[in-house]
């Protein structure tokens, strides 16, 4: 089984996204507005992401489609590294994970720096963005040259992102935190059984 590295270097190890060999299904994207806001209601409170399509058009379109479809509703903040990033984007519904698993996006050019508060897709190398994203909890400009293209930023409630549960630590093979392969396959049941303290998205919605 091949594993997908989201960020090729970190303060405390690599960020991973599993990548099993499964056929992709129809995942056509809707053209997003030039600017739009997404409100995340979470177990720690609310935060708002403002997306600017010009920063990363393909990434902005994908995020718009995922939010509108309810993909992020119930998604755990399964990897929290205080002072670096918080990562999410594995759906609670295994069928949704299967649908989007191999729906890779062509890379957008990096037009903005990965400063604190920006939101960016993880990658497994060139042209491999799917659903997993991370919020930069610090100024991570060193990621810019690695191809990580921010498509938006947290404009309200950044203090909420700083508070997500972090004690489970790194996932395998570096630690005992959530295993992304199992999380994709089992969804919410896996997190509730083995990692019940993780914070999660109650509802993500496009603001009118």
Give the location of each predicted region.
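N-terminal export leaders
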Residues: 3-8
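Hydrophobic helical h-region of N-terminal Sec-dependent signal peptides
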Residues: 10-16
């Amino acid at each position: 089984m091949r594993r997908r590295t989201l960020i090729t270097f970190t303060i405390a190890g690599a960020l991973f996204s599993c990548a099993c060999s499964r056929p992709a299904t129809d995942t056509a994207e809707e053209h997003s507005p030039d600017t739009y806001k997404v409100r995340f209601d979470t177990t720690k409170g609310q935060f708002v992401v403002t997306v600017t399509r010009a920063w990363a058009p393909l990434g902005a379109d994908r995020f718009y489609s995922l939010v509108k479809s309810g993909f992020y509703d119930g998604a755990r903040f399964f990897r929290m590294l205080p002072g670096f990033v918080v990562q999410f984007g594995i759906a609670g519904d295994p069928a949704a994970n299967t649908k989007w698993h191999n729906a890779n996006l062509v890379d957008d050019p990096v037009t903005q720096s990965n400063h604190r508060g920006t939101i960016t897709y993880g990658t497994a190398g060139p042209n491999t963005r799917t659903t997993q994203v991370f919020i930069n909890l610090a100024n991570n400009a060193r990621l810019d040259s690695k191809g990580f293209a921010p498509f938006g930023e947290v404009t309200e409630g950044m203090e909420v992102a700083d508070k997500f549960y972090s004690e489970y630590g790194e996932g395998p093979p570096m630690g005992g935190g959530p295993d992304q392969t199992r999380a994709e396959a089992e969804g919410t049941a896996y997190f509730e059984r083995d990692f019940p303290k993780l914070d999660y998205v109650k509802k993500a919605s496009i603001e009118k």
